[in-house]
Amino acid sequence: MKIKILSTGDEIVSGGVVDTNASWLAASLLGLGLTVDCFVAVGDDFGTLRRTIADLAAETDILIVTGGLGPTNDDITAEAAAGAVNTKTILNPEALGLVTDYFNRKGWPMNPSNKKQAVLPRDCRVIENEVGTAPGFYLRISGCHGFFMPGVPKEMKAMTLNWVLPWIQRYAAKNLGRTLTDITPRTITVFGLPESEVGARLKDLATQFPGVRPGFRADFPLIQVKLYPDSEKRGGGENILDQAEQFVVTTLGRWVISREGLTMEQEVGRLLVQKKATIALAESCTGGLMASMLTDVPGSSEYFIFSGVTYSNEAKIRVLGVRQSTLESHGAVSEETAGEMAQGVRRLTQATYGISTSGVAGPGGGSPEKPVGMVCIGIAGPGFCTTKRYGFAFNDRTMNKQIFAVTALGALRKRMLMQGGSV
């Protein structure tokens, strides 16, 4: 089943508005095992829009169009759709009734311009808009099934969930002999391997599991392995996805940090909650990035206590109690200093875990002994303090800070998993 998505509006093609509708639609269709062939966006030019609708409809089974159903002069989708099938628009009584009823329910006066939203192609089927004023419509365009919906996300989503997806499921069952059930794609988060290596290790995945379509998404420094049901080769549905997921986890082993698609900070937060543990941070080279990441997670107040950006040596001494002699003998960027920082912030806050970072983010400031990309990480906990030096080959300050922060959280994750149970 071929599906294409067309988004309309000058605001989209000019870059003024990010088209989130298309990505949401694609994700919703993937849950049924359906792949979108392409996204297309056009502005508010009648001729271009009419031709685009006709051209896309000629080469697809289903065309989903969003935008251009409002009450203003630049809302021209209904007229363009009518032009694509060489018909006229009419004031649709059913659509007019829906628009009028909406205003009556709200107790609002209806502007005469809103009648334009009921002017639809002749012979179309009206799709009710339960959360807005603009009805959508279904239109057969030669052999293509066209669905036209408003561009307002909440209105488009309601129509998709209540009308479009159920229609597609019925169509597939009746005409294609397939039952499209809603199956959640699997997302496995990986850290510590480049995307090319992940792909190489999983090169046989699609062959071994023909009912699964794998995908890879890099979100530095993490990689997400996506497993989608393939509607053309559905096979065992949930069962085949479960098998493929286990194959990925077994193949990638210790590089997998989450089978639920969690980020590193989300996974660390989950473990802290599970262990009823708390965390405090002493950040130098990461400049508060770890704190920002952790507190972006809803519910982080349950485990996050404190973060101090102890950038200078004086701050390390006065706030964390790092010894002057340690700094003089080993320098700020050293495992010795990182260890004392972690112990100091844990002592200061009485947190279960104290985490520290001290490194060279670059692009300048490195030396042969301590090059750009070097970071020392300390973790202090009940009865232990461990440190480790890491080296990365990035000469970009932002990338180094990101990978330093995720590496530090990853080190804590490993430590918590090693301990098992509660702290």
Swiss-Prot record:
Pfam families in the cross-refs: CinA (PF02464), MoCF_biosynth (PF00994)
InterPro entries attached to this UniProt entry: CinA, CinA-like_C, CinA_C, Competence-induced_CinA, MoaB/Mog-like_dom_sf, MoaB/Mog_dom
Domain of life: Bacteria
Disulfide bonds: none
Alphabetized Gene3D superfamilies for the sequence: CinA-like, MoaB/Mog-like domain
Family the UniProt entry places it in: Belongs to the CinA family.
Name of the molecule in the record: CinA-like protein
